[in-house]
Protein backbone atom coordinates (compact mmCIF):
# COMPACT_ATOMS: atom_id res chain seq x y z
CA UNK A 1 0.00 0.00 0.00
CA UNK A 2 3.01 2.32 -0.11
CA UNK A 3 3.17 4.92 -2.90
CA UNK A 4 5.37 4.06 -5.85
CA UNK A 5 7.73 6.81 -6.93
CA UNK A 6 8.58 6.00 -10.55
CA UNK A 7 11.53 7.73 -12.24
CA UNK A 8 12.53 7.59 -15.90
CA UNK A 9 15.59 7.63 -18.11
CA UNK A 10 15.14 8.87 -21.67
CA UNK A 11 15.95 6.46 -24.51
CA UNK A 12 19.36 7.06 -26.04
CA UNK A 13 19.24 4.70 -29.00
CA UNK A 14 15.95 4.41 -30.87
CA UNK A 15 16.45 2.69 -33.21
CA UNK A 16 19.21 0.68 -31.53
CA UNK A 17 21.28 0.73 -34.74
CA UNK A 18 20.82 2.55 -38.07
CA UNK A 19 19.87 -0.80 -39.66
CA UNK A 20 16.98 -1.44 -37.25
CA UNK A 21 13.38 -0.66 -38.00
CA UNK A 22 11.46 0.92 -35.15
CA UNK A 23 8.30 2.91 -34.61
CA UNK A 24 10.25 6.15 -34.37
CA UNK A 25 13.63 7.77 -34.77
CA UNK A 26 14.35 9.61 -31.54
CA UNK A 27 17.09 12.15 -32.11
CA UNK A 28 18.04 14.67 -29.43
CA UNK A 29 15.32 17.10 -30.57
CA UNK A 30 12.64 14.47 -29.95
CA UNK A 31 13.67 13.89 -26.34
CA UNK A 32 15.14 17.22 -25.23
CA UNK A 33 11.95 18.77 -23.85
CA UNK A 34 11.40 15.78 -21.53
CA UNK A 35 14.46 16.64 -19.43
CA UNK A 36 12.39 19.32 -17.73
CA UNK A 37 9.99 16.72 -16.32
CA UNK A 38 10.71 16.26 -12.59
CA UNK A 39 10.67 12.46 -12.85
CA UNK A 40 13.29 12.26 -15.61
CA UNK A 41 16.71 11.39 -14.20
CA UNK A 42 18.76 11.36 -17.39
CA UNK A 43 19.70 9.50 -20.56
CA UNK A 44 19.32 5.71 -20.53
CA UNK A 45 21.94 3.19 -21.49
CA UNK A 46 24.09 4.66 -24.26
CA UNK A 47 24.39 1.53 -26.40
CA UNK A 48 26.08 3.26 -29.32
CA UNK A 49 29.56 3.14 -27.83
CA UNK A 50 31.05 3.38 -31.31
CA UNK A 51 29.14 6.62 -31.87
CA UNK A 52 30.37 8.00 -28.54
CA UNK A 53 34.00 7.10 -29.22
CA UNK A 54 33.94 8.42 -32.79
CA UNK A 55 31.86 11.55 -32.05
CA UNK A 56 28.77 10.71 -34.08
CA UNK A 57 26.88 14.03 -34.29
CA UNK A 58 23.52 12.63 -33.14
CA UNK A 59 25.10 10.78 -30.21
CA UNK A 60 27.14 13.82 -29.17
CA UNK A 61 24.01 15.99 -29.36
CA UNK A 62 22.17 13.65 -26.98
CA UNK A 63 25.06 13.62 -24.52
CA UNK A 64 25.46 17.41 -24.63
CA UNK A 65 21.71 17.89 -24.10
CA UNK A 66 21.69 15.59 -21.06
CA UNK A 67 24.71 17.35 -19.58
CA UNK A 68 23.15 20.77 -20.23
CA UNK A 69 20.22 19.68 -18.05
CA UNK A 70 22.61 18.30 -15.37
CA UNK A 71 21.28 14.77 -15.83
CA UNK A 72 22.94 11.37 -15.59
CA UNK A 73 24.03 9.35 -18.62
CA UNK A 74 23.93 5.59 -18.12
CA UNK A 75 26.21 3.28 -20.04
CA UNK A 76 25.94 0.05 -21.97
CA UNK A 77 29.46 -0.94 -22.93
CA UNK A 78 30.20 -4.66 -22.86
CA UNK A 79 33.85 -5.54 -23.47
CA UNK A 80 34.95 -1.94 -24.00
CA UNK A 81 38.59 -1.58 -22.92
CA UNK A 82 41.65 0.65 -23.10
CA UNK A 83 41.47 3.97 -24.89
CA UNK A 84 37.99 3.21 -26.23
CA UNK A 85 36.74 2.88 -22.65
CA UNK A 86 38.64 6.04 -21.69
CA UNK A 87 36.91 7.98 -24.48
CA UNK A 88 33.50 6.57 -23.53
CA UNK A 89 33.86 7.63 -19.90
CA UNK A 90 35.43 10.98 -20.81
CA UNK A 91 32.30 11.74 -22.84
CA UNK A 92 30.32 11.69 -19.59
CA UNK A 93 28.96 8.14 -19.42
CA UNK A 94 29.37 7.41 -15.73
CA UNK A 95 27.74 4.03 -15.17
CA UNK A 96 27.60 0.59 -16.72
CA UNK A 97 25.47 -2.51 -16.20
CA UNK A 98 27.17 -4.75 -18.79
CA UNK A 99 30.06 -6.05 -16.66
CA UNK A 100 30.38 -9.83 -16.88
CA UNK A 101 33.52 -10.31 -14.79
CA UNK A 102 35.56 -8.62 -12.09
CA UNK A 103 38.33 -7.41 -14.40
CA UNK A 104 35.85 -5.56 -16.61
CA UNK A 105 34.10 -4.01 -13.61
CA UNK A 106 37.32 -2.97 -11.88
CA UNK A 107 38.65 -1.36 -15.07
CA UNK A 108 35.47 0.73 -15.24
CA UNK A 109 35.58 1.57 -11.54
CA UNK A 110 39.18 2.73 -11.94
CA UNK A 111 38.00 5.13 -14.64
CA UNK A 112 35.34 6.60 -12.39
CA UNK A 113 32.26 4.71 -13.53
CA UNK A 114 29.59 3.39 -11.19
CA UNK A 115 28.77 -0.28 -11.62
CA UNK A 116 25.17 -1.47 -11.75
CA UNK A 117 25.40 -5.12 -10.76
CA UNK A 118 22.80 -6.83 -12.91
CA UNK A 119 20.70 -9.81 -11.94
CA UNK A 120 17.88 -10.10 -14.45
CA UNK A 121 16.16 -12.90 -16.32
CA UNK A 122 18.60 -13.48 -19.18
CA UNK A 123 21.75 -11.81 -17.86
CA UNK A 124 22.81 -12.62 -14.31
CA UNK A 125 26.12 -11.21 -13.12
CA UNK A 126 25.74 -11.05 -9.34
CA UNK A 127 27.77 -14.17 -8.56
CA UNK A 128 30.70 -12.95 -10.66
CA UNK A 129 30.56 -9.40 -9.29
CA UNK A 130 29.66 -10.01 -5.64
CA UNK A 131 33.31 -9.49 -4.58
CA UNK A 132 32.84 -5.81 -5.52
CA UNK A 133 30.55 -5.47 -2.51
CA UNK A 134 33.46 -4.79 -0.18
CA UNK A 135 34.76 -1.64 1.50
CA UNK A 136 37.04 -0.77 -1.43
CA UNK A 137 34.33 -0.69 -4.12
CA UNK A 138 30.84 -0.81 -2.63
CA UNK A 139 30.28 2.97 -2.61
CA UNK A 140 30.28 2.92 -6.42
CA UNK A 141 28.12 -0.19 -6.85
CA UNK A 142 24.36 -0.65 -6.98
CA UNK A 143 21.91 -3.31 -8.10
CA UNK A 144 19.76 -3.42 -11.24
CA UNK A 145 17.71 -6.01 -13.09
CA UNK A 146 17.99 -4.62 -16.64
CA UNK A 147 15.50 -6.97 -18.33
CA UNK A 148 13.37 -9.10 -16.03
CA UNK A 149 10.30 -11.02 -17.14
CA UNK A 150 7.02 -10.26 -15.33
CA UNK A 151 6.71 -13.89 -14.22
CA UNK A 152 10.12 -13.63 -12.54
CA UNK A 153 9.07 -10.42 -10.82
CA UNK A 154 5.98 -12.16 -9.46
CA UNK A 155 7.70 -15.39 -8.42
CA UNK A 156 11.10 -14.13 -7.23
CA UNK A 157 10.87 -10.39 -6.71
CA UNK A 158 12.84 -7.42 -7.98
CA UNK A 159 15.74 -5.69 -6.21
CA UNK A 160 14.70 -7.47 -3.00
CA UNK A 161 15.57 -10.76 -4.71
CA UNK A 162 19.08 -9.47 -5.51
CA UNK A 163 19.56 -8.41 -1.89
CA UNK A 164 18.60 -11.89 -0.67
CA UNK A 165 20.84 -13.58 -3.22
CA UNK A 166 23.78 -11.30 -2.37
CA UNK A 167 23.39 -12.20 1.31
CA UNK A 168 23.27 -15.90 0.40
CA UNK A 169 26.59 -15.38 -1.41
CA UNK A 170 28.17 -14.05 1.77
CA UNK A 171 27.67 -10.30 1.36
CA UNK A 172 26.99 -8.56 4.66
CA UNK A 173 23.25 -7.75 4.93
CA UNK A 174 23.80 -4.03 5.56
CA UNK A 175 26.16 -3.84 2.57
CA UNK A 176 23.62 -5.56 0.30
CA UNK A 177 20.84 -3.24 1.44
CA UNK A 178 23.10 -0.22 0.95
CA UNK A 179 23.86 -1.26 -2.65
CA UNK A 180 20.14 -1.71 -3.27
CA UNK A 181 18.93 1.57 -1.77
CA UNK A 182 21.43 4.14 -0.58
CA UNK A 183 23.99 3.90 -3.37
CA UNK A 184 21.41 4.01 -6.15
CA UNK A 185 19.72 7.04 -4.57
CA UNK A 186 23.07 8.84 -4.26
CA UNK A 187 23.97 8.09 -7.87
CA UNK A 188 20.68 9.47 -9.17
CA UNK A 189 20.88 12.49 -6.83
CA UNK A 190 17.72 11.48 -4.96
CA UNK A 191 18.99 13.03 -1.77
CA UNK A 192 15.97 12.24 0.42
CA UNK A 193 15.75 8.58 -0.65
CA UNK A 194 17.64 5.41 0.13
CA UNK A 195 17.77 5.43 3.92
CA UNK A 196 15.56 4.88 6.95
CA UNK A 197 16.30 8.13 8.74
CA UNK A 198 14.66 11.47 9.59
CA UNK A 199 13.86 13.44 6.45
CA UNK A 200 14.05 10.42 4.13
CA UNK A 201 11.01 9.10 2.27
List each model region and its residues.
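Hydrophobic faces of well-ordered beta-strands that scaffold small-molecule active sites
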Residues: 6-10, 41-45, 73-75, 95-97, ...
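Short acidic, glycine/serine/threonine-rich loops at helix termini
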Residues: 17-23, 54-58, 84-88, 107-110, ...
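Phosphate/diphosphate-binding loops
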Residues: 6-8, 121, 190
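His/Asp/Glu-enriched, well-ordered alpha-helical/loop segment
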Residues: 132-201
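Divalent-metal coordination cores built from histidine and acidic residues
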Residues: 1-70, 136
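Divalent metal-binding pocket/active-site signature
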Residues: 45-102, 107, 119-123
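Structural recognition of alpha->loop->beta junctions
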Residues: 28-42, 88-107, 138-142, 171-172
